[in-house]
């Protein structure tokens, strides 16, 4: 969901322009009270940074934060610059030859803010409430790369890029095909890596742990003591292990079948709908097991170990 964070100060100015047609005031910076009498109060920004927004105003600039960690920023810059160029052209065309230029600028700014204010959102962009609110506002919710790629070759996009001499229709179609192929290859590599990790490391390790638990149950019972805790844990781990093995087998099957889909667009959709979905099914019990399997048996450092201890390397 694409939204824009303006912050309290700029949002207040925009709302004044929409409601009154003029901005006569703005929210000013406050003081950060440290609570310590020996330290001075500090100036603080009139707004925060909102790290959940994909497109945020941060005091003196806008930040576009949606570029993937492994992607080049060049394609995003090309698209953003082309969009800005089109907007400037439309504005220039509307202002060309007007008698009262200042009033025309004023009215146009008010109209643009009013027409497009639905994209402004200053709240938590990760919340379910925002998903519902975005739907109410009529904003698109594009959930995967495969869903986003067709936007490159829509008649509207082709007209935009061709009118500014950026891309031809053939160039856009070729880029779309390349993106489909890159997506399919990336998910294929991740799926095979997941199969290797689950089959050669996690499942054998959990089997060893369940064996240890089973022996513990027998030993405690032979001693005449209550082994219900060990038995309950054994049942829980065995249940997750069963789910994981089923998803593991399914992932091997659906990944192998992907090679039979020859059309690159359909193959990308197959990886999204079948392979990625099965990967999520495999991860779910693995995440549960990571929380309850003895550290000595788990084959990888846990998130907690990586974040909070210095012996993560020793666990590899």
Segments and roles (model prediction):
Residues 308-316:
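Conserved small/polar residues in nucleotide/adenosyl-binding loops
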Residues 259-271, 293-307:
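Long amphipathic alpha-helical coiled-coil segments
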Residues 250-263, 310:
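Long, low-complexity or tandemly repetitive, helically biased scaffold regions used
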Residues 83-86, 90, 197, 201-208, ...:
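Charged, amphipathic alpha-helical oligomerization/scaffolding segments
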Residues 63, 70-74, 204-205, 210-212, ...:
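Flexible loop/turn segments at secondary-structure boundaries
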Residues 1-178:
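Active-site capping/gating regions of soluble enzymes
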Residues 180-214, 218-221, 229, 261-264, ...:
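Extended alpha-helical coiled-coil "stalk/arm" regions that scaffold and mediate dimerization/assembly
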Residues 216-242, 246-247:
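Generic long, charged, amphipathic alpha-helical segments
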């Amino acid at each position: 969901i694409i939204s824009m964070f303006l912050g309290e100060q700029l949002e207040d100015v925009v709302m004044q322009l929409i409601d009154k047609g003029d901005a006569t005031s703005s929210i000013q910076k406050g003081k950060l009270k440290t609570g310590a009498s020996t330290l001075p109060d500090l100036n603080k920004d009139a707004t925060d940074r909102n790290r959940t927004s994909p497109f945020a105003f941060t005091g003196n600039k806008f930040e576009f934060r949606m570029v993937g960690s492994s992607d080049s920023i060049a394609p995003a810059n090309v698209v953003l610059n082309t969009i800005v160029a089109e907007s400037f052209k439309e504005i220039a065309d509307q202002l060309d030859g007007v008698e009262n230029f200042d009033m025309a600028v004023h009215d146009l700014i008010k109209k643009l803010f009013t027409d497009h204010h639905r994209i402004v959102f200053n709240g938590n962009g990760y919340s379910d409430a925002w998903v519902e609110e975005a739907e109410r506002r009529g904003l698109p919710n594009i959930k995967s790369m495969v869903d986003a790629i067709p936007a490159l070759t829509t008649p509207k996009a082709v007209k935009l890029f061709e009118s500014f001499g950026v891309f031809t229709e053939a160039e856009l179609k070729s880029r779309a095909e390349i993106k489909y192929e890159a997506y399919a290859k990336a998910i294929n590599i991740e799926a095979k890596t997941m199969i290797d990790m689950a089959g050669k490391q996690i499942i054998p390790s959990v089997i060893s742990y369940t064996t240890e638990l089973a022996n513990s149950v027998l030993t405690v019972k032979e001693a005449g003591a209550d082994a219900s805790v060990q038995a309950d844990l054994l049942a829980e781990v065995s249940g997750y292990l069963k789910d994981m093995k089923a998803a593991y087998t399914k992932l091997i099957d659906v990944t192998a079948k992907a090679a039979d889909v020859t059309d690159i667009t359909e193959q990308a959709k197959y990886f999204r709908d079948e392979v990625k979905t099965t990967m999520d099914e495999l991860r779910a019990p693995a995440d549960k097991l990571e929380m309850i399997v003895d550290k000595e048996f788990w084959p990888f450092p846990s998130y907690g170990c990586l974040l909070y201890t210095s012996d993560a390397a020793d666990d590899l």
